[in-house]
Amino acid sequence: MQVLVVSPPLIAAASLSKPLNSLSKAALSFSRAKPICPFPQTSRRPISVYKSPMNNLFNRLGFGSRPQAQADPSSAAIAQGPDDDVPSSGQQFAQFGAGCFWGVELAYQRVPGVTKTEVGYSHGIVHNPSYEDVCTGTTGHNEVVRVQYDPKECSFESLLDVFWNRHDPTTLNRQGGDVGTQYRSGIYYYTDEQERIAREAVEKQQKILNKRIVTEILPATKFYRAENYHQQYLAKGGRMGLRQSAEKGCKDPIRCYG
C-alpha cells in the first residue's frame, strides 16, 4: 500500500494575524515527572475532524487550517462581534488560547491579581456553540480562558508569562496529543495596550526560538462560556476526583487528565 506523504504548509494564513508570536527557552522547560504533563497528552477529549478526506488527513496530522463551516450570516456576525461582557469595576479582561482549557485555567487561577477565570469558546462563526459542536472542527472556535484581573496587582506581561510557559506556540493547531483548530495558540486582546505588549513580547520571544511561532494575535471576539462541567475542571477534581490546588502562588505541577 502506497502512503501519500503531504508536506504541510508552515502556517495557515487564515489562522494568523500580523507578526507571529514567540516564546523563550524557559517556556519550553517542562517537568518530566509523571504523571505531570506540560500540555494535555491523554485528555480523552474528541479530536477535531473535517468532513472532506483531505481536510481530515491534514487535521489528523495537526496541520489543518481553520474549517469552513456553512454558518448563517446573522449567526456568524454575532459570533465574530466584540465581547460585550463587562468586567468588574477596576478590572480588565484578556483571552488566551493555549491548548486544552482545563490546565490553562488552573494556571491562571493561581496567579495573584487574577480575580476570575472562565473557560469557553471564541473566534468561531457559529452563535452559541456547544462543546460537541466545537469538537467537530467545523465552527472555527478556539478553546480559550477568559481572565479577569486587577491591573494594579497583576500586569498583562505576567499573564503572558503564564501563556508562554503553559504551551508550545510553535505547533500549529495542536498541543501534545490534542489535535484540531480548537487547540490553536492565540492571544486575544481587549485594548490597544494589550495588543502592543503582546506583539512586543512575541518579537522578543521569537529571537530566542529556532522555530517559528504560530500564535495568532487578534481582537477578542464574543466569548461563549463553556458548560459548567468544564469550569474550574481540575480544581474540582475532574473525572478522577483528584483536586488540584488553585491557591494563589501555588507552584504544584499541573497534572492533566480527562
Swiss-Prot record:
The keyword Plastid applies. It holds the Pfam family PMSR. Its EC number is 1.8.4.11. Induction: By light in etiolated seedlings (at protein level). Residues 1-53 form a transit peptide. Expressed in rosette and cauline leaves, and at lower levels in stems and flowers (at protein level). Residues 62-89 are annotated as: Disordered. Gene3D superfamilies: Peptide methionine sulphoxide reductase MsrA. GO terms for biological process: cellular response to oxidative stress; response to light stimulus. Keywords: Acetylation, Chloroplast, Oxidoreductase, Phosphoprotein, Plastid, Transit peptide. The modification N-acetylmethionine is found at M54. It comes from the Eukaryota. One of its GO terms (cellular component) is chloroplast stroma. The modification Phosphoserine is found at S245. It catalyses: L-methionyl-[protein] + [thioredoxin]-disulfide + H2O = L-methionyl-(S)-S-oxide-[protein] + [thioredoxin]-dithiol; [thioredoxin]-disulfide + L-methionine + H2O = L-methionine (S)-S-oxide + [thioredoxin]-dithiol. It is found in: Plastid, Chloroplast stroma. Optimum pH is 8.0. InterPro entries: Met_Sox_Rdtase_MsrA_dom (IPR002569), Met_Sox_Rdtase_MsrA_sf (IPR036509), MsrA_MetSO_reductase (IPR050162). GO terms for molecular function: L-methionine:thioredoxin-disulfide S-oxidoreductase activity; peptide-methionine (S)-S-oxide reductase activity. The keyword Transit peptide applies. PANTHER family: MITOCHONDRIAL PEPTIDE METHIONINE SULFOXIDE REDUCTASE (PTHR42799:SF2). Catalyzes the reduction of methionine sulfoxide (MetSO) to methionine in proteins. Plays a protective role against oxidative stress by restoring activity to proteins that have been inactivated by methionine oxidation. Prevents the methionine sulfoxidation of the heat shock protein HSP21 and its subsequent inactivation. MSRA family specifically reduces the MetSO S-enantiomer. This is Peptide methionine sulfoxide reductase A4, chloroplastic. The gene is MSR4.
